[in-house]
Structure formats: C-alpha cells, structure tokens
Amino acid sequence: LQVDYLVLEVA
C-alpha cells in the first residue's frame, strides 16, 4: 500500500 508514506507526512 502507499499509505505508509501518507501517514508519515500527516505525522
């Protein structure tokens, strides 16, 4: 999935 990087950005 490509949510890993998305979550890091939101964090």
UniProtKB/Swiss-Prot annotation:
GO cellular component: extracellular region
Keyword Secreted: yes
Domain of life: Eukaryota
Keyword Secreted attributed: yes
GO molecular function term, any single one: serine-type endopeptidase inhibitor activity
Keywords, in A-Z order: Protease inhibitor, Secreted, Serine protease inhibitor
GO-annotated biological processes: regulation of proteolysis
Cellular compartment(s): Secreted
Assembly, per entry: Forms protease inhibiting heterodimer with TMPRSS7.
Family per similarity comment: Belongs to the serpin family.
Function (record text): Serine protease inhibitor. The major targets of this inhibitor are plasmin and trypsin, but it also inactivates matriptase-3/TMPRSS7 and chymotrypsin.
Protein name per the record: Alpha-2-antiplasmin
Organism in which the protein naturally occurs: Struthio camelus (Common ostrich)
Lineage, highest ranks first: Eukaryota, Metazoa, Chordata, Craniata, Vertebrata
